[in-house]
Amino acid sequence: MAKAVIRKPKKKVCQFCKEKATGVDYKDTALLRKFISDRGKIRARRVTGNCVQHQRDVAIAVKNAREVALLPYTSTGR
């Protein structure tokens, strides 16, 4: 049998660095919903492809949006 070819996964590029965005606004819920799961959890960097600084900014913005009740807190599904 031939050996399966192992391909490296394509590196994701930070969406904010690519667009030269100045920052992440907690009031922009449409943008922030891309970075939370259907359960309301913040997605990891390796999933979203964000750089370190922008992932921190997204996490802070999501937490602020939750405080103001623009985004839901995590649900357990019980």
Swiss-Prot record:
One of its GO terms (biological process) is translation. Keywords: Ribonucleoprotein, Ribosomal protein, RNA-binding, rRNA-binding. GO terms for cellular component: cytosolic small ribosomal subunit. One of its GO terms (molecular function) is structural constituent of ribosome. PROSITE patterns: RIBOSOMAL_S18. It comes from the Bacteria. The keyword Protein biosynthesis does not apply. Binds as a heterodimer with protein bS6 to the central domain of the 16S rRNA, where it helps stabilize the platform of the 30S subunit. Belongs to the bacterial ribosomal protein bS18 family. PANTHER family: 30S RIBOSOMAL PROTEIN S18, SMALL RIBOSOMAL SUBUNIT PROTEIN BS18A. Part of the 30S ribosomal subunit. Forms a tight heterodimer with protein bS6. This is Small ribosomal subunit protein bS18. It comes from Nocardioides sp. (strain ATCC BAA-499 / JS614). The lineage of its organism: Bacteria, Bacillati, Actinomycetota, Actinomycetes, Propionibacteriales. The gene is rpsR.
